[in-house]
């Protein structure tokens, strides 16, 4: 089966936001950038700031990743500023729900994104990946992404 990018609907967005807010908070704690007691509130604020109008926030594109009309296997969110000098879009969030991982769907989704991005006039895709997420890093490298900046921290 082939992954389809379909514009996220309101109910899908609500479910996505609940899931991803929690997951992002956990990842920030795991990365050591947020304290556990602050993480949920900070995560909610990040998403409120980035998507003040939800699905209607200009230049943000949120898709459900589907195998067919009803089976949602994941999500993908990009920001594509039309006036960006490099015609670049930033992947804010991308993921598959646990039962669908390791089946090749992530590569299919990124290939579908490449095609959609080209049709939007985008010439470059960028993203952030947590250093501890070796699976994601490997996926991105296998699909043509390269490191451009590295941020490092040291606990004292």
UniProtKB/Swiss-Prot annotation:
Its EC number is 2.3.1.-. Residues 11-156 form the N-acetyltransferase domain. GO terms for molecular function: acyltransferase activity, transferring groups other than amino-acyl groups. This is Uncharacterized N-acetyltransferase YycN. Keywords: Acyltransferase, Transferase. The gene is yycN. Belongs to the acetyltransferase family. Gene3D superfamilies: 3.40.630.30. It comes from Bacillus subtilis (strain 168). It is an enzyme of class 2 (transferase). Homodimer. InterPro entries: Acyl_CoA_acyltransferase, GNAT_dom, N-acetyltransferase_domain.
